[in-house]
């Protein structure tokens, strides 16, 4: 049983890693690709990239709760394998996309199959207990970190043979992972813990509204929402910001993302396993959010390219907050509804991705345009810092309410 659990954890980690590699492959070359296809400047390319992210996220927002609910009915294994196969098909399509319309179509397909994160997170929740829950969820961040090391490097190296080659490689990885999972991945959700599929709970709004029955999740979900939203200041604009302000090349962007990946991997894969149990979830969340805020603000005032690499340190250290938030939220939901919860959380993340990229990229495009009263390419980072401070406030309110409830129960 223990060996099966370890094998399953390894598979889930590799699955998430491959997902992020596919994403990381695109980032360094996307500005150049969009400018080449559409013959536009950096600001307009940034805005177009925001709408591509919008297409991906809007689709994922709609399908994530459906995938989560299907995994609660049929189990995690078949849904996860289906998502992996679909991701492979998506990359094959993108490898031959001749126009921007085909890229948009590919992003829509990726939004549907990208819900593999939903099932993977539910799988982790199934096989975790209170002692290792935060550490196991830290693997998600570690996969992001390693993916951001490997993905941009693959994109840079294989891109030398043509812009489509990295997508073919990503498709091959997805299909290999599908075959591996088909033979070694056990089911994590026993039949007596499954429930019937309910369309009312399988829509993004319904899934979120259903979470109202858990008393303290409201404030924690708002805190999580603000963290996700703030992250798009970086996710949507890093390449365009560094090109505009420092004149970085795709190679330099790829190296910087490799540094991000290395730092995130260390924090999520190693540091959270030591620091989070020592600090506890509440203090990990507070300290992490403050570090996030500091790093985000410093990005906006950086005056030289090397400063961006230095300022990555406090920002990435803030990553201790993510697993602690995830662990706190999942601990308040019973095992029968973990799939639904993860679907709702993925929908929440996707909702911020529907809002965040257009807001952050258009704010960036405006702040560097002649129409802006002041040239301020760091404007999205300043907005992100404000959102992160708001997240810390909502987390504080949630924990204060939780403590008051515990005291009330003791008195009664």
Q: For each predicted feature, which ranges?
A:
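Short amphipathic helix-loop junctions that connect adjacent transmembrane helices
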Residues: 29-46, 236-253
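Juxtamembrane intracellular "pre-TM" segments in multi-pass secondary transporters
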Residues: 1-5, 186-223, 244-245, 411-412
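Helix-breaking motifs and short loop linkers at transmembrane-helix boundaries and internal kinks
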Residues: 75, 96-101, 113, 247, ...
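A membrane-interface helix-boundary motif in multi-pass transporters
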Residues: 159-172, 362-388
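Helix-to-loop junctions at the C-terminal end of transmembrane segments
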Residues: 63-75, 267-281
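Conserved MFS/SLC helix-loop-helix module at the cytosolic interface between two early adjacent transmembrane helices
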Residues: 61-100
